[in-house]
């Protein structure tokens, strides 16, 4: 075998998946990336390489802060619960992480601060006052993802404030056309704030050289070239309080933008792993001159951050850059975007309740390649392909031979292997399949494997052991035929081991032999296997239907819970909580205010004044002219003849439209929501309000 790992030096790899955001459940879209990365990692381990496979929850940002408030818990409590759920889902799909951590950790805080201070020391951080979108209703600066509007470049509507899903462009939220707050729906206003910036343009030549290295996917390199031609911009790395994240060292009420500390979470998770193990050295993997290999698996929606900002941050702070960033497309279901109403937005946990995770691992592998293509999970094709390939072609190869070995030969394979040429053809395929695994061309590797399975089954069909078993004096021939079939199955399962580790483990128990890449070089002879048990079950379409229905129920329950939480929060948000009581005053201060009952004698709109009404008030033998900003709440004619309360001893104020000689009392937040105070029947003009 030319690709025998014993012929190559052992590689040391650090592999990561993009960090799932800690405000929701893992779904089948997430699983594409994690399955893709896990297959590659398992292949590398199978070849004898040292792999550290890490991930973490991305646990910072305004969305997490707001959702925690909605759920009535602290952000720390929420992200802890989400982390448990995420790790359970990944374990259910046999994702073989060496460590799973959180960006809200001591390791990440220390590393984020260190990298920032190094960048600042090296002249890559600057600050300036910017005009930023501010929600006037919620009284908070709006993070990028909480502003929506029309993309300034391609004009696609309903796009987030940091980047466009349609064209991939990144921009400032202030550049959006017709922006709206995603928190309240209000039109944001501009407000000044000091922000801190990472000087990305200083790294343009380095990034261009990195792009020309030839290792990046063609689509990624082409996209980066577009960004270079458009001109790199300084990157805003700060956010204002209130914000859930890490405070910027030396600054008050200023926090790191989530996209600064999120990729540093790769380092934080690895640092956490190093602290648990004596055989790992953090610096060996992250020093600028590291000889180890670093790979990131990500989705196409976050290429900009990983191919520009991240390598520039690392380079500017004295750390190594990734060897490569492997980008994949999105998952669609039945040719369309995943839909909660149709039940095709399937959570990982819902899938695991109804179907074998190995089925999805196989199907994704069968359709994955090294390009940035979207992958369609066609549920009918999913059923047919898994049943046809895994059950009918591969597992059936074992079942149709194992019975004869167990019953007629006490589980022992033949001493002589009678089909060396056929077996060598299977062994020779190892080099080609290895190249395809290494290149992440999993679909092509699966096609090579199933083509071999067809040849193996053709051999069994031609030799017909069920016929030979009925012929006297043919025991040795029967044993030899079935032993060939079992050995070909062993080779196939070795090649399939990175894709279907649970099936491979059951196969190893059946064969009484570990499946190793170098082990396929020689067939098993005179070897005892165990009694055959069903290794894999067919997909029942009814289980898929049940999964879809359960997903619809999940979506409905999620919506109901959200509405309940919103209603609860609305009920808790009292007028007093929205507008707290002012600072205490002494009684003598209050006694200075002279409140009197007044009768509205006349009321009219003030020309060229949007908010004002002009009143003539009788306060008990004396007439007063008063202007009041309640025009949006009342028609002037409706107020004539009513009684109200007025501050009678307020110093007259000269206004553009005349002198105002008092103040009418009204309650409410403003605008249309204002109500003048009216006394009970019996109160007369001039009476003092006690």
Swiss-Prot record:
Q: Where does ATP bind?
A: 340
Q: Where is this motif: 'HIGH' region?
A: 20-30
Keyword ATP-binding among record annotations: yes
Class in the EC hierarchy, top level:
ligase
Q: Which UniProt keywords apply?
A: Aminoacyl-tRNA synthetase, ATP-binding, Cytoplasm, Ligase, Metal-binding, Nucleotide-binding, Protein biosynthesis, RNA-binding, tRNA-binding, Zinc
Disulphide-bonded residues:
none
The catalytic activity, as recorded, is: tRNA(Met) + L-methionine + ATP = L-methionyl-tRNA(Met) + AMP + diphosphate
| One GO BP | methionyl-tRNA aminoacylation
Q: Which cofactor does it need?
A: Zn(2+)
Q: Function, please?
A: Is required not only for elongation of protein synthesis but also for the initiation of all mRNA translation through initiator tRNA(fMet) aminoacylation.
Q: Which family does it belong to?
A: Belongs to the class-I aminoacyl-tRNA synthetase family. MetG type 1 subfamily.
> Could you identify this protein by its name?
Methionine--tRNA ligase
């Amino acid at each position: 075998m030319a690709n025998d790992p014993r012929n190559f030096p052992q590689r040391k790899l650090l592999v990561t998946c993009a960090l799932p955001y800690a405000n929701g459940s893992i779904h089948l879209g997430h699983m594409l990336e994690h399955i893709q990365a896990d297959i590659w990692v398992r292949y590398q381990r199978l070849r004898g390489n040292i792999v550290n496979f890490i991930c973490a929850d991305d646990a910072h940002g305004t969305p997490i802060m707001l959702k925690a408030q909605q759920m009535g818990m602290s952000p720390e409590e929420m992200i802890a619960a989400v982390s448990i759920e995420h790790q359970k889902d990944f374990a259910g799909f046999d994702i073989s992480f060496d460590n799973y951590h959180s960006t809200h950790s001591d390791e990440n805080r220390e590393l984020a601060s260190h990298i920032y201070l190094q960048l600042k020391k090296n002249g890559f951080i600057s600050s300036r006052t910017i005009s930023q979108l501010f929600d006037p209703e919620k009284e908070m600066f709006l993070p990028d993802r909480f502003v929506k509007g029309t993309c300034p470049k391609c004009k696609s509507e309903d796009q987030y404030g940091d980047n466009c899903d349609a064209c991939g462009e990144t921009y400032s939220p202030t550049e959006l056309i017709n922006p709206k707050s995603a928190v309240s729906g209000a039109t944001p206003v501009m407000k000044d704030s000091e922000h801190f910036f990472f000087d990305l343009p200083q790294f343009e030549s380095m990034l261009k050289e990195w792009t020309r290295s030839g290792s990046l996917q063609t689509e990624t390199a082409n996209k980066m070239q577009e960004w270079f031609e458009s001109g790199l911009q300084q990157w805003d790395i700060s956010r204002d309080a209130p914000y859930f994240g890490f405070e910027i060292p030396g600054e008050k009420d200023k926090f790191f933008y989530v996209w600064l500390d999120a990729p540093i979470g790769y380092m934080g998770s690895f640092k956490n792993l190093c602290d648990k193990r004596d055989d790992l050295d953090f610096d060996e993997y992250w020093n600028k001159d590291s000889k180890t290999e670093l790979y990131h698996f990500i989705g196409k929606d976050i290429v900009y951050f990983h191919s520009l900002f991240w390598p520039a941050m690392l380079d500017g702070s004295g750390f190594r850059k990734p060897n490569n960033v492997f980008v994949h497309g999105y998952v669609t279901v039945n040719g369309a975007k995943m839909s909660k109403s149709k039940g095709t937005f399937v959570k990982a946990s819902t899938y695991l309740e109804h179907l074998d995770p190995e089925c999805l691992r196989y199907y994704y592998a069968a359709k994955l390649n090294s390009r940035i293509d979207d992958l369609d999970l066609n549920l009918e094709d999913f059923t047919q392909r898994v049943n046809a390939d895994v059950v009918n072609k591969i597992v059936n190869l074992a079942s149709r031979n194992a019975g004869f070995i167990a019953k007629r030969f006490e589980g022992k394979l033949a001493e002589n292997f009678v089909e060396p040429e056929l077996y060598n053809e299977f062994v020779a395929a190892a080099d080609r399949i290895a190249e395809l695994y290494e290149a992440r061309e999993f679909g092509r590797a699966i096609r090579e494997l199933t083509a071999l399975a067809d040849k193996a089954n053709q051999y069994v069909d031609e030799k017909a052991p069920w016929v030979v078993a009925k012929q006297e004096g043919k025991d040795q021939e029967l044993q030899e035929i079935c032993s060939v079939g079992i050995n070909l199955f062993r080779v196939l399962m070795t090649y399939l081991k990175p894709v279907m580790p649970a099936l491979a483990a059951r196969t190893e128990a059946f064969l009484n032999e570990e499946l190793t890449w170098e082990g396929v070089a020689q067939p098993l002879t005179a070897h005892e296997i165990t009694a055959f048990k069903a290794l894999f079950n067919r997909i029942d379409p009814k289980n898929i239907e049940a999964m879809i229905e359960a997903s619809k129920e999940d979506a409905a329950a999620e919506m109901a819970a959200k509405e309940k939480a919103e209603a609860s929060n609305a009920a808790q948000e009292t007028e007093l909580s929205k507008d707290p009581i002012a600072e205490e005053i002494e009684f003598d201060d209050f006694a200075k205010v002279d409140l009197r009952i007044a009768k509205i004698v006349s009321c009219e709109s003030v020309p060229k004044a949007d908010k004002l009404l002009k009143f003539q008030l009788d306060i008990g033998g004396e007439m007063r002219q008063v202007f009041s900003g309640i025009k949006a709440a009342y028609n002037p004619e409706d107020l004539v003849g009513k009684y109200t309360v007025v501050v009678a001893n307020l110093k007259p104020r000269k206004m553009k439209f005349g002198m105002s000689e008092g103040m009418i009392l009204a309650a409410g937040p403003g605008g249309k929501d204002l109500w003048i105070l009216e006394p009970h029947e019996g109160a007369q003009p001039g009476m003092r309000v006690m």
